[in-house]
Amino acid sequence: MVNWFRRRKKRVVVPRLHTRGETPAAVNKVDLAELTPTLEPYLAQAAYLQLTIFETLSSALVTAPSTESKEAVSRAASFSLAKHHGLVAELARKGVDAAEAMKPYAARIDDYRRRTLGANWHETMVTAYVTAGLLDDFYRTLASGLPAEPARRIAEVLDTEDGHELIMGELKRAIENDPKLASKLAMWGRRLVGDTLLIARSALAMPADGHSEEARLEPVFTELVAAHTRRMDALGLTA
């Protein structure tokens, strides 16, 4: 059974997240390559999202509790900024002004960032950990529908160091020092998944009548959530 989130006027769809041990009904999984946007909108959205992750980590840097934490967060932020620059370089190859290309998506993505930033340093760090992981996985998979040569270069950009280990180390230390954080951060992580899948889905080049694709998208997003669950497990948190 598929349960979709709906927004008034504009229908936005995210697959239901299955609980552990639950087996979804068999469906014909869509190949994301069929729904990949053309190169310019792909790059513009991916680049702006990397910039957003950098902004999130920059916010965490300001309130980091120690010099060691500031150093770790700054390094993680630099990796996201490097990915942003790598994707912007691909736009430049096409003679496209990156700032202009990103403008149509900025308001929607900025709203997503505001809703997922977190109320404190620990939540902001979980936001960076969860959203960067999910979005990198999504855009890496989506790149398979791009022309071969730019797809290869984009994969190289997205496969570079991501800072997850640095963020995970900081969060593990925080949870060890205050075990009560675990349940709060696990809950926050679960809240982030829906919003992040919505922003990912908005990048897809859906047909005018995309209703037939919705059920076929569920296994794709279920795979993304499975990878997210493994990352949360690595933190000792329940996804």
PLM regions with names:
Residues 1-69, 73:
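Short, extreme N-terminal leader segments that mark the start of a protein/domain
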Residues 3-11, 76-103:
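Conserved alpha-helical segments that form or flank metal/cofactor-binding pockets of metalloenzymes
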Residues 24-44, 105-128:
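Acidic/His metal-coordination segments adjacent to aromatic residues that form catalytic metal sites
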Residues 38-43, 68-82, 124, 149-163:
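Alpha-helical scaffold segments that form or flank carboxylate-/histidine-based iron centers
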Residues 42-46, 50-53, 57, 114-159, ...:
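Acidic/histidine-rich alpha-helical segments that form the ligand environment
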Residues 54, 84, 88-91, 136-139, ...:
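A structural signal for well-ordered alpha-helices, especially hydrophobic packing surfaces
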Residues 143-179, 183:
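Charged, well-structured binding/catalytic surfaces in domain cores that contact anionic ligands
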Residues 181-239:
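Extended, helix-rich structural scaffolds rather than catalytic motifs
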